[in-house]
Amino acid sequence: MENAYSKAGVNVEAGYEVVERIQKHSQKTQRTGTLGMLGGFGGCFDLSSYKLKEPVLVSGTDGVGTKLLLAIEEQKHETIGIDCVAMCVNDVVAQGAEPLYFLDYLALGTVNPAKVEAIVAGVAAGCCEANAALIGGETAEMPDMYEADAYDVAGFAVGIAEKSQLLTPSNVKEGDFLIGLPSSGLHSNGYSLVRNIFFKKHSFKTTDKLPELAPKTLGEELLTPTKIYVKELLPLLKAGLVHGAAHITGGGFLENLPRMFSSALAAEIQLNSWPVLPIFKLIQKYGEIPPEEMYEIFNMGLGMILAVSPEHVEKVQELLPEAFEIGRLVPRKTKAVIFKEAL
């Protein structure tokens, strides 16, 4: 017999099924400190094994933005959870902290257990990549708020650091080298503009195969998951090799780089020092976007940029052979970010 909640559009039984389906995915993410209490009123994590003199918890929260619309249109939900985790844990590790645990929030018009499982499986995969435990979350069915197929996902990450080892603007010095870590593509920013350029202005289809993106289709390129930098950065952080880190997300170089150094400094960027990924060249071409604006919106092929003292550059490059030396920190005159070579 249909109950009152079902008549209002909320499928309670589907919600119960979701809880059963996602248990196995969260269990894969367990790490030291996990108490295995998924399903309680709050997620619990034991910090007693982390022997720090002045422990500091560092938290981050984010979503995936309108990249979700592509996932919904393409009915490909398996990797969007990786994006959600990446956006949060990359912010946490950029502060100098080791991610410990993660919680997700999923709001939908209609709960489809298989779809929710696919999304949460992606979250769990991202957590495994970041070595962060998935200790809780919320799935909210809101038929009056969302269309039947629509959903939104957000995440919350918490990490830990010794207070003296936090990456703060005061750590970054004049003469420090800027080391860029390659991105996997657009990551999770700029999709409102990108969708407008490719699908509205130029009527591309997600199945289109552009030579510059081969062997991927346009849709596959745009749904490539955001790269998670935790495994690359933690050894450097523990060895004291990094003065600062900037996660290049919304706002690109111009907004995010200045967040890691003081107002007395500027980032001098050598533009020809790394390969700009083909997807960005296509966006600039078809969107007729001025070069400087591209660096104000997108990561341009570098998802994380580190400030490293001259004496540590060689060691960092040894540990991160795929990274690029892209510039230096110099005294600021006017602009916080200076591009060498004409844009």
UniProtKB/Swiss-Prot annotation:
Q: Name one GO cellular component term.
A: cytosol
- The organism sits in which domain of life? Bacteria
The protein's Enzyme Commission number: 6.3.3.1
The answer to whether the entry has keyword Nucleotide-binding is yes
Matching InterPro entries, A to Z?
Answer: PurM-like_C_dom, PurM-like_C_sf, PurM-like_N, PurM-like_N_sf, PurM_cligase
Q: Which Pfam families match?
A: AIRS, AIRS_C
Give the Gene3D superfamilies listed for this entry.
PurM-like C-terminal domain, PurM-like, N-terminal domain
Query: Do the record's keywords include Transferase?
Result: no
Q: Which reaction does it catalyse?
A: 2-formamido-N(1)-(5-O-phospho-beta-D-ribosyl)acetamidine + ATP = 5-amino-1-(5-phospho-beta-D-ribosyl)imidazole + ADP + phosphate + H(+)
**Compartments, record wording:** Cytoplasm
Residues crossing the lipid bilayer are none
Question: Which keywords does this Swiss-Prot/TrEMBL entry list?
Answer: ATP-binding, Cytoplasm, Ligase, Nucleotide-binding, Purine biosynthesis
GO MF annotation terms: ATP binding; phosphoribosylamine-glycine ligase activity; phosphoribosylformylglycinamidine cyclo-ligase activity
Which BP terms from GO are recorded? 'de novo' IMP biosynthetic process; adenine biosynthetic process
Query: Pathway it acts in?
Result: Purine metabolism; IMP biosynthesis via de novo pathway; 5-amino-1-(5-phospho-D-ribosyl)imidazole from N(2)-formyl-N(1)-(5-phospho-D-ribosyl)glycinamide: step 2/2
Give the UniProt family note.
Answer: Belongs to the AIR synthase family.
PANTHER family, A to Z: TRIFUNCTIONAL PURINE BIOSYNTHETIC PROTEIN ADENOSINE-3 (PTHR10520:SF12), TRIFUNCTIONAL PURINE BIOSYNTHETIC PROTEIN ADENOSINE-3-RELATED (PTHR10520)
Q: What is this protein called?
A: Phosphoribosylformylglycinamidine cyclo-ligase
